[in-house]
């Protein structure tokens, strides 16, 4: 279960238990729902002719999956608002069949100046594949309630 603002400390780290093996259906559904017509995500022939030689998983799916995996352990039940995502990088591609796992580390904490009983937590979220390659990373800031409020 997620924690409240006053229960976090800088340096707290979570290796999220939930993992996901990305399927063709995951990629196809997300790509079509978001109207992304990039052939590298949809066209096996075009993808085979690319430098990657196979279909690439949509990067925004990878990002969304990373955030989704972290919610139960970070913000579920204590979130007031997501404030933003910074320094999003995708240093390695994700392919169909990759198994992805996420981790989170608190890198900044500060009580809200305008909202008593609330505070801002910034996590570094990372996602790795089964080869332990970093495939996605970002900083996420969220406004959380304090348990003591």
Residue ranges and their predicted role:
Residues 2-10, 90, 94-99, 103-149:
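HotDog/MaoC-like acyl-thioester-processing domains
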């Amino acid at each position: 279960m997620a924690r409240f603002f006053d229960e976090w400390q800088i340096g707290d780290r979570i290796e999220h238990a939930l993992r996901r093996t990305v399927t063709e259906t995951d990629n196809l559904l997300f790509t079509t729902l978001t109207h992304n017509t990039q052939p590298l995500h949809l066209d096996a022939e075009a993808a085979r002719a690319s430098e990657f030689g196979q279909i690439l998983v949509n990067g925004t799916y990878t990002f969304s999956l990373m955030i989704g995996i972290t919610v139960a352990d970070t913000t579920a039940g204590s979130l007031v608002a997501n404030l933003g995502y910074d320094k999003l990088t995708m240093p390695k591609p994700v392919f169909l069949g990759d198994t992805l796992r996420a981790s989170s580390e608190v890198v900044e904490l500060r009580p809200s100046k305008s909202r008593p009983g609330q505070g801002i937590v910034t996590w570094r979220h990372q996602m790795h594949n089964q080869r332990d390659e970093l495939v996605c990373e970002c900083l996420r800031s969220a406004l959380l309630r304090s348990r003591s409020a």
